[in-house]
Amino acid sequence: MRGQFWLVMSCYIITIICKLAFCIKLIENEKSIFGFKSKKKDMKKLSNIKVRNWKQKKIQQFFIINKVKNKKYNNLKKSLNMEYSNTDDQRLSLLKNLENKSKIITQSPAWNEKIPLLEINDLHAIEVEGGKEILKGINLTIYLGEKHSIMGRNGSGKSTLAKVIAGHPYFKVTKGSMKFKGLNLTDLTVNHRSLCGIFLAFQYPIELPMVKNNEFLRTALNCHRRQNNEPELSPSEFDLLMINEIKKVGLSPEFLDRPVNYGFSGGEKKRNEILQMLILKPSFCILDETDSGLDVDSFKLTSDIIQKFSNINNSFLIVTHYKKLLELLKPNYIHIMHKGKIIKTGNYSLVDKIESDGYAQFVEE
């Protein structure tokens, strides 16, 4: 009898468990129908969605990166393997994008020191965006060994003239001519002008956050050394050269490891421009308000360097508002600009007249 009792009880317990399991399953199904899923399942589903989206994003990035890499590779391949190019023009256009290490012409065979270093005749230039005319008939002649200064009111076109000579892409020459060492300057690229010996120290030096100063300077110097048939400098050789040069401008060696002009003070930026001038040794230096924004010590240091660097083998075009720098450099000629034209040229005595009576005496309103 006892065995039969436990058998009946076991069957009864199993029946209850099965009914409970059925009820639980039924409740879960009802929740699923009406959108009431368990939090655990929701979290699991959300996690799966995030993982899926992350994978899709990574796949997209992979294809985009490889697309860019393939494009660069194909361009290089096309330029080196001529089977993809149908004409000589196509081959030349592709090769122009590669670094050109060949020598270029930096002066006319007929040019000598008795011929003007820079000769500008009736120069007109406009802004590329907007088409506003800034330069309206500039005439300027500079010989080797001379120092010229451009002065004038704000907005008269001084900085624009400096940038047009250097080949700034924001401006376009519409009329007139510029010759440098006998070459037609308007036909030359910015890099070509630099190799010819033209150097521009910006009023507001550009920041290059991703380029270290030593890499920038060494690359620029090696371009000039190649042009002069001199061996390129390795990083270690360049560092040795810079030990003395960087001291001249009052900067520490750690300065070379910093990005170009990024996070620099105003004085450091200007001294960095002067450092470039010392390294590249250009024959024509354009200083666009290099003296502005400098404290007393930085101004004295900068002006002393410019004065020592100036010699019979180079020329200067100095854009400034201040008499103090001109007192030290003693330019041969002073030019006054107004509304895109040079309206007056004279010797250093013009500086004293400007200092006493301003520009109104030279301007016909």
UniProtKB/Swiss-Prot annotation:
Taxonomic superkingdom: Eukaryota
Disulphide bond pairs: none
GO MF annotations, alphabetized: 4 iron, 4 sulfur cluster binding; ATP binding; ATP hydrolysis activity; metal ion binding
PANTHER family xref list: ABC TRANSPORTER I FAMILY MEMBER 6, CHLOROPLASTIC (PTHR43204:SF1)
SUPFAM superfamilies: P-loop containing nucleoside triphosphate hydrolases (SSF52540)
Residues reported to bind ATP: 152-159
Protein name as catalogued: Iron-sulfur cluster assembly protein SufC
Function: Participates in the sulfur mobilization (SUF) pathway for iron-sulfur (Fe-S) cluster biogenesis. As part of a complex consisting of SufB-SufC(2)-SufD, involved in assembly of [4Fe-4S] clusters. Exhibits ATPase activity.
